């Protein structure tokens, strides 16, 4: 793609580009205010920046033009989708470590760029503060990292059994139902064959699991 290689975006192109706005917000939420994320649309390179998070790092705003470095990266990304990490320092600006990701449409044409820039002039203590738990941080949530869907279901079942068994408020004769309720709330029954795995682990029939689920749904209506 060159500067003279312009063409009007289709509705699908626009939808693809706009879908990356959530990525901008997500990366910003994860890494923090010292990471600038810029989404460029190549439909109009004079005003290519259509979404920016933490633009205070370079004083850029929505509507800013594409950078010369991004243009050079574009020329080198016809076969690659992610640039090698690189360092930049604009005149009077901060030192940044950056990476550029090509956004392609269904014909593999590059229609946009996602640029992620980390401000290296920020003191390390400030940067790391974005990753530290504080009194205002939401309670941490447990997570299962599984290698297969079967492992995910099995791990979730075991953890749920432990949780229910540790709850003294749950009577022994209602524990299986409580386990099924908890698994239902965790969405585990959206996974194929989960009912069979739960029934086998709890040593109850599939019919019983279905009955518990049906009762839970009726109670929630």
Curated annotation (Swiss-Prot):
GO terms for cellular component: cytosol. InterPro entries: DauR-like, DauR-like_HTH, YheO. It comes from the Bacteria. To E.coli YheO. This is Uncharacterized protein HI_0575. It comes from Haemophilus influenzae (strain ATCC 51907 / DSM 11121 / KW20 / Rd).
